[in-house]
A protein has these predicted regions:
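Cap/lid and interdomain-hinge subdomains that line or gate substrate/regulatory clefts
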Residues: 36-39, 95, 100-235
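Active-site loops and adjacent core secondary-structure elements that bind or stabilize anionic groups
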Residues: 12, 221-260
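Single conserved hydrophobic/aromatic residue that forms the stacking wall/gate
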Residues: 2-9, 13
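Extended hydrophobic packing segments that form well-structured cores
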Residues: 367-490
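Short catalytic helix/loop segments, enriched in acidic residues and glycine
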Residues: 14-31
């Protein structure tokens, strides 16, 4: 939503100019094709009372994910203090002006007084700094594509911030025994992010799985067989289909339980399967594909992050996918370094490149039937891997730019979905920095979001974010961690 502020321009004519110009800008932004959501024009804000009223309307409007402000001319910033103090959603400060070029032949003091965003935006920016308030600043000309895309990118972050408070995670298992990094303070997570993380006995969900009708299971199995390649690999065809049907029942039962109880993310653990016949594999992959968050071995933080990142990418054209992921093993051959990413079963098929197959293989973890799972290799290109960790006195979001590649050779004996990437700036520095930061072996991974977007999300949440990218050096990174330990200390 666009908000505009006037300092009480000397005459109605000038105020009309300001309103007309802001309408033109809003209309152009909405027609640009570069914004994922609509910008709603609002009248010029002149008084303290109007500013407070408008910001509080934005607070209570469930369809409003944030506010965009622009100072057409000088705007005394004291008038903004109360409104900003009461405002609770993301804010973007667009530093632009209506005219692209100085009208050299006709410019006079009237024009200067009416078109001084260079003045007004500095005054406005100062009060944010004085109030120590987080905001995004985008500078440039409003008709330029790069500026419009920056606004569009921020919109997705704003949606992620606002929708975070609606994320509810269902845990059907506790944390894996003796594992540290997947632990965390769920109360602090609800304070910081708005996440509700609730536990259910696994057999309560098993009841929902067992209640799924055979007809519904058969229908979903037919969908699987139509959509995916079936790789029997010598297994009995009838038994194979029966195992696939178990996953269909798990998918339908879990989804109904999640929806009936208003959860958007789920956590499982192979050590606590109760009456489930198989470790949920294909079922969890399909739920992630539908937009649910997922975390394995009790990892509720990553489950919530996957959900948030899937919300942020909703409706994105040519999206390449977002998934739960785990670091497994390295290729350390010089010039071909990288990390093989996978999980026992649960990798989201939105990141798949090419055909997707169903396989069944024995799995020692869980001590259940051989589970059906989707198997594929992932897309190439730039992506990000993120890890949210609990340091005891604060959360830290670690964000790594990675370059996804194809493995040098196929891996015919590996019966799981995989990705392969090289962390920036390279495997050596990238992994050293990740370990120094305390990053987990689980990540929320996306081709469709940027480090900037996730850093902006963290800033809005008031938590530390550290970046590992092409410019990272270990000396600089260790200093940053040291400074942050002071800056973010409670």
């Amino acid at each position: 939503r666009d908000r505009l502020r006037s300092r009480g321009l000397g005459d109605v004519y000038k105020r009309q100019h300001v309103a007309e110009h802001s309408k033109i800008i809003v209309d152009a932004l909405n027609k640009s094709g570069n914004l994922p959501y609509e910008v709603v024009w609002k009248p010029t804000m002149i008084t303290n009372e109007v500013i407070r009223k408008t910001f509080n309307e934005a607070n209570t409007d469930e369809n409003c994910a944030g506010v965009i402000t622009w100072m057409h001319t000088f705007s005394p910033a004291k008038s903004w203090i109360l409104g900003l103090q009461e405002y609770r959603k993301p804010l973007l400060h667009l530093h632009t002006q209506f005219n692209r070029e100085i009208p050299y032949d006709t410019i006079d003091m009237d024009f200067m007084n009416e078109n001084q965003a260079a003045h007004g935006d500095r005054e406005y920016g100062h009060i944010f700094s004085r109030l120590n308030m987080e905001r995004k600043v985008v500078a440039g000309y409003w008709e330029d594509e790069d500026v419009q895309k920056q606004i569009g990118s921020w919109m997705r972050t704003a949606v992620g911030v606002v929708e975070s408070s609606h994320v509810r995670v269902m845990r059907v298992a506790d944390n894996m025994r003796n594992v540290a990094v997947t632990e965390g303070d769920k109360v602090e997570a609800q304070i910081k992010f708005g996440w509700e993380v609730d536990a259910y006995p696994v057999n309560e969900v098993v009841e929902a799985v067992n209640a799924v009708s055979q007809a519904d299971i058969d229908t979903l199995v037919e969908e699987y067989y139509d959509k995916y390649d079936i790789l029997l690999e010598g297994r009995d065809e009838k038994e194979f289909r029966e195992h696939v049907a178990v996953q269909a029942g798990i998918e339908l039962g879990f989804e109904r339980f999640l929806d009936e109880n208003n959860y958007q993310a789920v956590v499982t653990h192979f050590g606590d399967l109760g009456g489930l016949k198989q470790l949920p594999g294909l079922a969890m992959q399909r739920l992630m594909e539908k937009g649910y968050g997922f975390g394995a071995e009790g990892d509720w933080k990553t489950a919530a992050m996957v959900r948030v990142m899937k919300i942020m990418t909703q409706g994105m054209k040519d999206a390449k996918g977002t998934s739960f992921m785990e670091d497994y093993t390295y290729n350390l051959v010089s010039g071909k370094e990288g990390v093989l990413e996978a999980h026992m079963l649960e990798v989201c098929p939105t990141i798949a490149d090419g055909k997707i197959s169903i396989k069944e293989q024995p799995l020692s973890m869980g001590n259940r039937e051989d589970p059906a799972r989707l198997v594929f290799t992932s897309k190439t290109g730039p992506a990000i891997a993120t890890s949210l960790i609990d340091l005891g006195d604060r959360f830290r979001l670690i964000i790594n730019d990675v370059d996804c590649k194809k493995t040098e050779k196929p891996m015919p004996k590996l019966p799981v979905a995989t990705a392969f990437w090289t962390p920036q700036p390279n495997l050596k520095v990238g992994t050293e920095a990740w370990i120094l930061a305390g990053g987990a072996h689980h990540t929320a991974f996306s081709y469709d979001l940027t480090a900037e977007q996730m850093g902006d999300w963290a800033a809005c949440m008031g938590i530390e974010a550290v970046y590992i990218d092409k410019d990272t050096t270990i000396r600089q990174f260790k200093n940053e961690l040291l400074w942050n330990s002071v800056a973010y200390r409670k």
